[in-house]
């Protein structure tokens, strides 16, 4: 066998092997999910975004909530009978608000109990989805996060604060436009959060929590712990032992 053939075999191995390994991992995950569904009597749906290494080159991809995710999750919800509870296992840094909003509203409308399971973190749009649940089952060290909207690379609340600290004549047109968009984004997100939680918390408490989570009180990556989430009024259950 000549050198070029050996090189082709070497290249083929390092292309095919990672794919086979990933398929094996996926098969094990599906098996574990099906066993868990039988034990809990629920339909388990997963929304998992991890930084995955790809092949022997060590390249990686970072995943976020997108429209493809919402299509898949909504399809799974539609295929779940009304009398079957849903467990949504979520692990995500967040992502596209539209996609997260679609998932949250679909979960909210499901007639049976909805539990969102957070093994590690569900930030931003992930937290928005969790707000639609009847119960949020979190690992003791898992975290949620604020859902304040981001405009480009800046928090909407910070854009408004910067503009309000200056005279209008001292602010360029582009920044004024960003401030207008920021105001709309803040109102829309606050109203969405209120829609998701007001039935459970009541109007006054629901609006208070909606403001807290959207007003830019914290940085966007601020970790809301299990205890803090419970203090805010979220239906959090710490997973201190196997259930």
Describe every region a protein language model picked out:
Residues 1-118, 131-243:
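Terminal-region recognition feature
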Residues 98, 124-125:
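Residues that form or flank phosphate/diphosphate-binding pockets in enzymes
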Residues 109, 123-124:
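Long, distal/terminal scaffolding or interaction modules
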Residues 128:
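Short glycine-biased active-site loop of nucleotidyltransferases that positions the nucleotide triphosphate
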């Amino acid at each position: 066998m000549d050198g070029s053939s050996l090189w082709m075999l070497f290249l083929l191995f390092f292309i095919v092997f990672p794919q086979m390994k990933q398929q094996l991992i996926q098969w094990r995950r599906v098996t574990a999910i099906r066993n868990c569904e039988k034990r809990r009597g629920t339909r388990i749906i997963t929304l998992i975004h991890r930084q995955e290494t790809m092949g022997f080159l060590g390249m990686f991809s970072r995943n976020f909530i997108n429209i493809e995710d919402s299509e898949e999750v909504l399809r799974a919800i539609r295929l779940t009978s009304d009398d079957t509870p849903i467990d949504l296992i979520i692990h995500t840094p967040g992502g596209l608000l539209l996609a997260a909003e679609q998932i949250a509203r679909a979960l909210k409308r499901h007639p049976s109990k909805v539990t969102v399971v957070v093994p590690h973190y569900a930030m931003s749009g992930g937290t928005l989805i969790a707000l639609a649940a009847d119960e949020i089952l979190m690992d003791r060290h898992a975290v949620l996060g604020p859902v304040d909207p981001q405009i480009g690379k800046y928090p909407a609340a910070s854009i408004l604060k910067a503009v309000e600290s200056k005279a209008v004549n001292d602010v360029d047109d582009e920044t004024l436009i960003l401030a207008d968009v920021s105001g709309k984004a803040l109102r829309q997100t606050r109203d969405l959060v209120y829609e998701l939680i007001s039935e459970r918390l009541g109007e006054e408490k629901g609006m208070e929590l909606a403001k807290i989570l959207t007003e830019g009180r914290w940085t966007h990556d601020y970790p809301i712990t299990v205890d803090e989430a419970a203090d805010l009024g979220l239906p959090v259950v710490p997973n201190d032992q196997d259930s």
